[in-house]
Amino acid sequence: MATYDLIERLNSTFRQIELELVTLTERLKGCRLLAARVFTLPDVAKGAEHDELNTIEVEQHIGQEAVALTLAHYRHLFIHQQSEKRSSKAAVRLPGVICLQCDGALREEIESQIAHINTLKMAFEKIITEESGLPPAARFEWVHRQLPGLITLNAYRSLTVLRQPATLRFGWANKHIIKNFTRDDVLSLLEKSLKSPRTVTPWSREQWIERLEEEYDNIAALPAETRLKIKRPVKVQPIARVWYAGQQKQVQYACPTPMIALFDAEQGAMVPDIGELLNYDADNIQHRYKPQAQPLRLIIPRLHLYVAE
């Protein structure tokens, strides 16, 4: 059960995040704009949060318009800040970058403040997901009782700051969450579900128990040494590949929110090479390298659970 002290820390941590974001955006406004390019994605409609996306059309924004969208995006934490038709369960994504020039002292202040904001965001997420002791289904109600209308994923999302990047290229990443299990691991999970069964639409409680028992029997019939995998697809994500000329290295970043690239005023107006984010089309994905997939046999579809052949 969440204590009064925990609720106080939840609220005070969130207020700190809000305050720090206000002061950060003011600091960023004081920098010289070198370049900015961000890409708006279509809204996720209510009820469509888990729909598979085969195409995503992006719209490009540059210059001061991109900066304005970026600064508003950092502080977009509540559903009243968006269309009523847009889902409050899906975080708003705005890939891109703003490139700013400032003196060394201001750069250090900005980097330090962003690190502090990210620490607060991690603490806020930990309060909700770990310290509350609540199961996932109960967290939503608890958080929204304290902070009505909060878009939790937006509040969790960290900020990315870059120093002196030479080039930035944007793209899309298709990933899977893969976890390995033994037969006994899965049997243990199913046993827990059977001990505290719930009603899952469209089945009655009794029908759901029958399904769980059938799944349990199917797993129990496998040899003890069977290797099992959960291979669950993750919604396609925007990414950025950043090249640092001074270090001669490329780094790939998740890019759900605009990155902040800082450039020292002492080194002159070095404008980086910024690429576009093209529309996503699942039918035209080109893989640089696609290793041969391990043969898998689906055994429990709802869990994305496979037998490794």
UniProtKB/Swiss-Prot annotation:
Q: Which family does it belong to?
A: Belongs to the Tus family.
Q: Name one GO cellular component term.
A: cytoplasm
Q: Does the keyword Cytoplasm apply?
A: yes
Intracellular or extracellular location(s): Cytoplasm
Superkingdom, according to UniProt? Answer: Bacteria
- Coiled-coil region(s): none
Q: Which InterPro entries match?
A: DNA_replication_term_site-bd (IPR008865), Tus_dom1 (IPR036381), Tus_sf (IPR036384)
Q: Which biological process, per GO, is one annotated for this protein?
A: DNA replication termination
Q: What is its main location?
A: cytoplasm
Q: Which UniProt keywords apply?
A: Cytoplasm, DNA replication, DNA-binding
**GO molecular function term, any single one:** DNA binding
Described purpose of this protein according to its UniProt entry: Trans-acting protein required for termination of DNA replication. Binds to DNA replication terminator sequences (terA to terF) to prevent the passage of replication forks. The termination efficiency will be affected by the affinity of this protein for the terminator sequence.
Could you tell me what this protein is called? DNA replication terminus site-binding protein
Pfam families tied to this protein: Ter (PF05472)
